[in-house]
Amino acid sequence: MAMSSFLINSNYVDPKFPPCEEYSQSDYLPSDHSPGYYAGGQRRESSFQPEAGFGRRAACTVQRYAACRDPGPPPPPPPPPPPPPPPGLSPRAPAPPPAGALLPEPGQRCEAVSSSPPPPPCAQNPLHPSPSHSACKEPVVYPWMRKVHVSTVNPNYAGGEPKRSRTAYTRQQVLELEKEFHYNRYLTRRRRVEIAHALCLSERQIKIWFQNRRMKWKKDHKLPNTKIRSGGAAGSAGGPPGRPNGGPRAL
């Protein structure tokens, strides 16, 4: 109530301001191209400390992000892997890398190991024989190592005389042998070699066939066995003088 009465009763007069043209003419308001207007603004900005601090913080942030984005110079390439050892030599432990060298990544190390050539197979390494090399190739059986009177040739045979099998003569071979036996029951070494080459048989086979054929011929003709007769004659001739013809001693 007191304030309203004061305002009503007081002799208050509204102030009257000159127009804007007078302010501009009397330099109350600076013009748009006035140099003092910009200078005052610069002084006002430099005197405001919080804005300056914010500017430094932004500069640090920009520098920090720039440092994160810049990767810098690329790292040097990793050293090449050592060459594989020659075949036949025992592999040695790899030498440690030098102090200044950078170790490659695990993926690069695996690629370097897989790129090394595989060891040569046993057939390409004749200078260094090994048990695996001998196991790769089967033993070779040459013609002179084969035996005709043996039924099968075993390349893995260790030793010892195998059991001989019965030789099966063909009809043509038996016919030629019977012809030769009809003309001559005993052969010379030269004739035996000729017949063996002609019939594709060995000398031993020709010799055994003629022995068996002579025994059969003697049996067919009922001739005495010369081997048994010669053995008995030798025994009777070697007896003591008191026993003539190998008889019992007289009492």
Swiss-Prot record:
SMART domains linked:
HOX
Residue positions, PTM Phosphoserine: S90
User: What SUPFAM superfamilies does this protein's entry cite?
Assistant: Formin homology 2 domain (FH2 domain) (SSF101447), Homeodomain-like (SSF46689)
Question: Which keywords label this protein?
Answer: Developmental protein, DNA-binding, Homeobox, Nucleus, Phosphoprotein, Transcription, Transcription regulation
- Please give the GO cellular component terms listed in this UniProt entry: centrosome; chromatin; nucleoplasm
Check the record and name the InterPro entries matching this protein: Antp_homeobox_Deformed_sf, HD, HD_metazoa, Homeobox_antennapedia, Homeobox_Antennapedia_CS, Homeobox_CS, Homeodomain-like_sf
Pfam families found in the cross-reference section = Homeodomain
First-listed, main subcellular location of the protein, grouped into a coarse class: nucleus
Name its GO BP terms in alphabetical order: anterior/posterior pattern specification; bone marrow development; definitive hemopoiesis; embryonic skeletal system morphogenesis; hematopoietic stem cell differentiation; hematopoietic stem cell proliferation; morphogenesis of an epithelial sheet; negative regulation of transcription by RNA polymerase II
Superkingdom in the source lineage: Eukaryota
UniProt lists compositionally biased (Pro residues) regions at 71-99
Q: Which residues fall in a compositionally biased region of kind Polar residues?
A: 1-12
Which molecular function terms from Gene Ontology are attached?
Answer: DNA-binding transcription factor activity, RNA polymerase II-specific; RNA polymerase II cis-regulatory region sequence-specific DNA binding; sequence-specific double-stranded DNA binding
UniProt-annotated location(s): Nucleus
Coordinates of motif Antp-type hexapeptide in the sequence? 141-146
What cystine linkages occur within this chain? none
Question: Any idea which residues the entry calls the DNA-binding region?
Answer: 162-221
Q: Where is this region: Disordered?
A: 1-134, 220-251
**Physiological role:** Sequence-specific transcription factor which is part of a developmental regulatory system that provides cells with specific positional identities on the anterior-posterior axis.
Query: Which family is it part of?
Result: Belongs to the Antp homeobox family. Deformed subfamily.
Q: What is this protein called?
A: Homeobox protein Hox-B4
Organism per entry: Homo sapiens
Name the lineage: Eukaryota, Metazoa, Chordata, Craniata, Vertebrata
